Regions:
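Acidic Gly/Asp/Thr-rich repetitive segments characteristic of extracellular carbohydrate-active
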Residues: 53-84, 89
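All-beta strand scaffolds that present successive hydrophobic residues in beta-strands
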Residues: 85, 102-105, 132-135, 154-158, ...
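Right-handed parallel beta-helix/beta-spiral solenoid domain characteristic of secreted/periplasmic
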Residues: 65-66, 87, 100-143
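N-terminal Sec-pathway targeting helices
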Residues: 1-11
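Short glycine/acidic-rich loop motifs that flank beta-strands on beta-rich extracellular proteins
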Residues: 90-96, 114, 119-124, 143-149, ...
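Ser/Thr/Pro/Gly-rich low-complexity linker/stalk segments immediately outside membranes or between
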Residues: 25-47
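Hydrophobic alpha-helical membrane-insertion segments, chiefly the h-region
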Residues: 13-24
C-alpha cells in the first residue's frame, strides 16, 4: 500500500468516526413530555428548551411569570385555555374548578416552575374540572397533597417532580378516564401515588421512591 493511499484511507476513517461520535452526543430538545421524558432517565435539557406540549390549543394562552399568581390566571381562564407557568418559585394553592384547563410548567435550561408550600400550605394543586391537564411542575414542602383530584374526569397528570410533600404526592379520586405518567415522586409520608374510587386510570412510567408506599390503587376499576 503506497503512502498516498494510506493517508487518504486514514482521513476517511477519521471523518467517519467523527461523524458517528457527533451524532451520539446530540441531545434531543424536549418540546413535550408526550415522548416519555422523565426527570432522571429521559431527555437532556439544552439551552432552547420549551416543555409546552404539542397539542392543539383551542383557546387563549395565559403566561404566568414569577411574582404573578397562578390562581389569578386560573380565575381568568376560559375552558380550552392553556396557562403557561414560567420557571420560578410560586407559594400558593391552586384550585381548578373549570373544565378544559391546561396548566403547564415551562422548562427552560433545566429549570422548572416550582410550587413551594414552605411547610405551611396544605395542598399545591386541587382540581375538580373535567379535561384538566397538569404537567411539568416541581412541587415541594406542602403539608397535604401535591396534586389532588376530586371527581374530575379525563385528566392528565404527567412529567411532574413532587418531593418532600405531605400525605400523597398524586391523589386523584372519584374520577374516570385519567392518565398519570412520567412523574417522579419521593419523600411522601404515605403513598407517592394513590388512586382511590376511580375507573379506568392509566398509571405508567412513574418513578417513586423514599416514601412509605409507592403506588396504591384501591376501590378502583380498570
Amino acid at each position: 500500500m503506497n503512502t498516498k493511499f494510506k493517508v487518504v484511507l486514514a482521513i476517511v476513517i477519521f471523518a467517519g468516526g467523527w461523524i458517528m461520535g457527533s451524532n451520539n452526543n446530540v441531545a434531543p430538545v424536549i418540546t413535550s413530555s408526550m415522548g416519555g421524558a422523565s426527570y432522571n432517565g429521559g431527555f437532556k435539557a439544552d439551552n432552547s428548551i420549551s416543555a409546552v406540549p404539542q397539542r392543539n390549543v383551542e383557546g387563549s394562552v395565559i403566561v404566568v411569570n414569577p411574582g404573578d399568581s397562578i390562581q389569578e390566571a386560573v380565575e381568568m381562564a376560559q375552558p380550552g385555555d392553556t396557562i403557561q407557568v414560567m420557571p420560578g418559585t410560586y407559594s400558593e394553592t391552586v384550585y381548578i374548578d373549570k373544565d378544559d384547563i391546561h396548566l403547564v410548567g415551562v422548562i427552560r435550561e433545566g429549570e422548572r416552575a416550582t410550587m413551594d408550600g414552605l411547610g405551611k400550605l396544605n395542598d399545591a394543586i386541587l382540581y375538580s374540572g373535567n379535561n384538566v391537564v397538569v404537567e411539568n411542575f416541581r412541587i415541594t414542602q406542602y403539608k397535604g397533597n401535591g396534586i389532588m383530584g376530586q371527581a374530575g374526569n379525563n385528566f392528565e397528570i404527567r412529567n411532574n417532580v413532587i418531593v418532600d410533600t405531605g400525605i400523597y404526592g398524586i391523589f386523584p379520586q372519584l374520577g374516570t378516564n385519567g392518565l398519570v405518567e412520567h412523574n417522579v415522586v419521593s419523600g411522601i409520608e404515605d403513598a407517592a401515588i394513590y388512586i382511590g374510587m376511580s375507573d379506568n386510570i392509566h398509571v405508567a412510567h412513574n418513578e417513586v421512591f423514599d416514601s412509605v408506599a409507592g403506588i396504591e390503587i384501591e376501590n378502583s376499576r380498570h
